[in-house]
Each structure stands twice: as C-alpha cells, then as structure tokens.
Amino acid sequence: MTLSVSARHRLGTFELDASFTSEGGVTALFGRSGSGKTSMIRIIAGLLRPDEGQISLDGEVLADSGKRLFLPAHKRRFGYVFQEARLFPHLSVAQNLRYGRWFTTGKDTNANDDRIIDMLGISHLLQRRPNRLSGGEKQRVAIGRALLSSPRLLLMDEPLASLDEQRKAEIIPYLERLRDETKIPIVYVSHSIQEVARLADRVVVMKDGKVEAEGKAAEVLSRPDFSTYLERREAGSILSGNIESFDERHGLAAVRLNAALLQVPAKKATAGTPARVLIPARDVMLALVKPEGLSALNILEGHVTGISESEDGMVTIQMDCGGDIIQSRITDLSRERLHLEPGKPVHAIIKSAALDPY
C-alpha cells in the first residue's frame, strides 16, 4: 500500500502546506496542537477539500485540484475513528457494529466479524447501550465499527485524547493487536510521544502546517533534535536498542543500546527483539563523579554536547553517552553550580525509563 499526500489549504490565518508518503503499517502524524495534523487527516478522508494538491492510494487518484477531481468521502472506503466514539446512543453495541457493515460490499464475513470482536475484547458488551460503557470501551467499539466496514485505510484522529491515563493504558494493547493482526494501513494522529513511540512504524512530524521531519519511527524518534517538537513535560530521549534478557522475578528487561546496558521495567519482554526506550528529561539527574549507594539502576557516563535555555529558569542538557544521546532538564542554578559546558564529562543518573518493544 502506498499513500501519497500533497495538500495546500488556508483556514483563516492558518496555512497548511504539507506532503508525505506512507508505505503501509502505522504512519503517525505527530505534532503539537495546532500543527495541522487534524486538517491533514480530514483532507485524506475527503471531509475537507484542499485548495490545492493531490492524494492517491496505490495509484488511484482520490483528489487532484489541477484536474478538478475530488472523490467524496463515502466513496473512498476509509474507516475513521474520531476523538470521541460517536456511537449511536439508541443502538446496542452489536447494532452499532453492524452499522459498519452497511458500507461494505461482498460476501458474508461472520468469521471476520467474530475475529475483530474478539481482538478488541468487546464480545461481552454486545447487548449494552453506549451509556453503559466506559470511555475506553466506547472507543474500542468505535474502532470495531470502522474495521467492520472493511476499510482500505484506517484513519485515527487522536483516538485516546479524551481518555484518562488509566483508560489509555487499557486500550493501547488493543491498538497494538489491531496493528499486528489486521495489517490494515493506519494513519494515526497524536500529540502524545508515548502513543507514537509504541504504535508507529513511520512518523511524520508537523509544525505550523508544514512537515518538519519524516521517516521510519526508530530513526525519527531517535534524532537528537526531536525533543524540540515535544511539550516540555514530554521532552526527553527516545533510544533504539535490543533486549538482551528479561528478569521475570523483578520485572526488568536488559536493553542494549550503543554502549550502555539499561535495566528497564517491563511486564514481559523477549530476548533478541528490538525495543525503544523512553527516558524523560525531567527524570535524569547529573553528577560530576559516579555516585554510589543510590536506588537508581542506570548510571551512564558521557559528556555534555549542548545546552538549551528556556524562559522558566530551566535548561536542557544534552549528553553523548557512548553514542546514545541523553537529555536532562535541570535548573539553571544547577547548571551554574556544576559548571556545565559542552565537552564536560558527566554521569547521567536515570531515575525512570519506559520500554516499548516493537
């Protein structure tokens, strides 16, 4: 599957001028609020007609402003999952799911329906009405309805944005199964680095209506300058490595990076598989000498490569630890007391890290 998108569109004072391609799997449109992600996915869906541009899927032209061609949304055979579930309140879950079948043609596919229902873990909800579902359950039903329409492409616009952290944690594993088992190409809009790092095969970074970076997720997310696109609270390092071993008793995975071996909390992990490690900058302390007697499991030796200041009295210190780029967010006073400057040797004390196998 090859999706090619090029669009220019003005909305008030905001101008979208962006292009990208997707070769299947999960392509994440990532960026801060107002970067143009939702406008782009609405253009792909056919819900917004661009002023200029062209969209094609596997060689089929869906929109071409030069030829005045625009295929309506209902003829594109795309599934769409919104921020809110948008279920019909007067219908049961089973009836909401069957609604998706109205948009597909072909033979009866009860076996496929059952597979999707099982994959999303909603078989026990079929007779309930939406008002008796949790937020996470509603979104799983909405995803099921979109899948039952047999879409050529699944569009997901911030599907977890309206959920609290507990509900997000509940639904993420189902999205992983969706990615791995259905093989339906997905365009996934999000401003959450945790979601993107866990789900995406390819990342398109958007800012002010333009594409700033594009490529394989492992490559884009590991770039030293990627943190500039993150909210301050999410700033940090995303490193690629391989799982060497898993300590089931202590729930720790040993992840080999370029030079370091990190111990990272994990419920399960398989030795020999690739993984990404998320290290929040706010959870990295710095020391000039290697400390002893700490509870922190990971202490990396490196040197300062860059310092970025912000208006809130905080600075971001970038370090090279054996080829792995680590970031730490500390106060400007701490920077002064440690006399930190590019080239200075330091030890990075990692208080927490998250593992995302892929």
Swiss-Prot record:
Q: Under the cellular component aspect of Gene Ontology, which terms does the record hold?
A: plasma membrane
Q: Where in the cell is it found?
A: Cell inner membrane
Keyword Cell membrane recorded = yes
Which GO-annotated molecular functions does the record name?
ABC-type molybdate transporter activity; ATP binding; ATP hydrolysis activity
**Record's keyword terms, sorted:** ATP-binding, Cell inner membrane, Cell membrane, Membrane, Molybdenum, Nucleotide-binding, Translocase, Transport
* Location of the Mop domain: 293-358
* Annotated ABC transporter domain residues: 1-233
Q: Which catalysed reactions does the entry list for this protein?
A: molybdate(out) + ATP + H2O = molybdate(in) + ADP + phosphate + H(+)
**Pfam families tied to this protein:** ABC_tran, TOBE
Membrane topology is: Peripheral membrane protein
Instruction: Tell me if Nucleotide-binding is a UniProt keyword of this record.
Output: yes
For binding ATP, which residues are annotated in this chain's numbering? G31, R32, S33, G34, S35, G36, K37, T38
What are its E.C. numbers? 7.3.2.5
Its annotated function is as follows: Part of the ABC transporter complex ModABC involved in molybdenum import. Responsible for energy coupling to the transport system.
Q: How does it assemble?
A: The complex is composed of two ATP-binding proteins (ModC), two transmembrane proteins (ModB) and a solute-binding protein (ModA).
Which family is this protein grouped under?
A: Belongs to the ABC transporter superfamily. Molybdate importer (TC 3.A.1.8) family.
Q: What is this protein called?
A: Molybdenum import ATP-binding protein ModC
The organism's taxonomy opens as: Bacteria, Pseudomonadati, Pseudomonadota, Alphaproteobacteria, Hyphomicrobiales
